[in-house]
């Protein structure tokens, strides 16, 4: 759960965090008994705890298909991300990955920590994949083939232009959006969304991750991963790694704001995609990550910390998003609130200020025209810095009760 300091600063986070804690425990108890499915769902919770929770929104058949789709693509991504694999070995694996998923004996040792376990024990994923319906299998195979080919292309090619950047993000994330739309359609729950809108859903998430993960990617050993397009960063520095040096802070922030402004172009498409969804479970599955993305962009914007360490939404706010996202009015409210926060951080002297403000105003206009903003729940109102002692005492009492309850349950489970 969130740290005590964070809870005292944001006491409104406590209840959503508590619900998230119990939801996580419930999700862990839902792991199927069959060894290959048990491996897949356990691995899902390890490689992405938040996705492991969000996927629980879906019905059983679709949940299984999305779980396997996610693990197959995480495995593919693990091969791409491992900079120690020689190009002549990596490219053929990426190109043939869509065939390997049919092979119960195939595995390839690479990656670290839980990703290495995923790759070493990949036969469990293949076994589970082969139990899916043919419609799900075909969709997963098609997207895996196209993504592997795209990744292979960019192993041998740098991201030079914004068009390159959009193309790379299409291969590694836009195709995920297309694949999920196909899975939703195959389940009979949704109409097939257009490729353009599906692509934007993936690009908005991927560009947010690329912006947030700048420092981790540039410091990757033995070789940096460089996804920011030269067409953007070359306006500010001579080399991409120069952005992390303190003497370049002013230029680095301008470059960062340029990248965020580029990502915002996809927000309106995302709102359109989500507004077309019919099923509440699929809606929540899609909406929660998109709200997290615009929230993360709001935190990153104009923030030098992106070049010094990790920038991410506090756990309590994440819990709040998961708890409160139920309808499209919640999404419009969240996008409106976070775009207001972004707008408040725009420096009029920033070279992209006019473009940034224009994109934010377009997002706000779409949210206002929905006619639902009066119903919105606030995501960004900061708590007062000081809270009275009675409130703090109540929180400590609740925490003590919760700790005692969880401890007693743990002892009972061990007996």
Curated annotation (Swiss-Prot):
Pathway: Terpene metabolism; lanosterol biosynthesis; lanosterol from farnesyl diphosphate: step 1/3. Keywords: Endoplasmic reticulum, Isoprene biosynthesis, Magnesium, Membrane, Multifunctional enzyme, NADP, Transferase, Transmembrane, Transmembrane helix. It catalyses: 2 (2E,6E)-farnesyl diphosphate + NADH + H(+) = squalene + 2 diphosphate + NAD(+); 2 (2E,6E)-farnesyl diphosphate + NADPH + H(+) = squalene + 2 diphosphate + NADP(+). Induction: Induced by jasmonic acid (JA) and methyl jasmonate (MeJA) in adventitious roots. Induced by chitosan (CHN). Accumulates upon Cle-mediated signaling, an elicitor derived from fungal cell walls of C.lagenarium, thus inducing the accumulation of saponins. Triggered by ethylene (ACC), rose bengal (RB), nitric oxide (NO). Accumulates in response to hydrogen peroxide (H(2)O(2)). Induced by N,N'-dicyclohexylcarbodiimide (DCCD) in a nitric oxide (NO) dependent manner thus leading to increased ginsenosides accumulation. It holds the Pfam family SQS_PSY. It is a multi-pass membrane protein. GO terms for cellular component: endoplasmic reticulum membrane. Its EC number is 2.5.1.21. One of its GO terms (biological process) is response to nitric oxide. Its cofactor is Mg(2+); Mn(2+). Mostly expressed in the shoot apex (buds) and roots, and, to a lower extent, in stems, leaves, flowers and seeds. It is found in: Endoplasmic reticulum membrane. The keyword Protein biosynthesis does not apply. InterPro entries: Isoprenoid_synthase_dom_sf, Squ/phyt_synthse, Squal_synth-like, Squalene/phytoene_synthase_CS, Trans_IPPS_euk-type, Trans_IPPS_HH. Its main location: endoplasmic reticulum. The chain crosses the membrane at residues 281-301, 391-411. GO terms for molecular function: squalene synthase [NAD(P)H] activity. Belongs to the phytoene/squalene synthase family. Component of the triterpene saponins (e.g. ginsenosides or panaxosides) and phytosterols biosynthetic pathways. Catalyzes the biosynthesis of squalene. This is Squalene synthase 1. The gene is SS1.
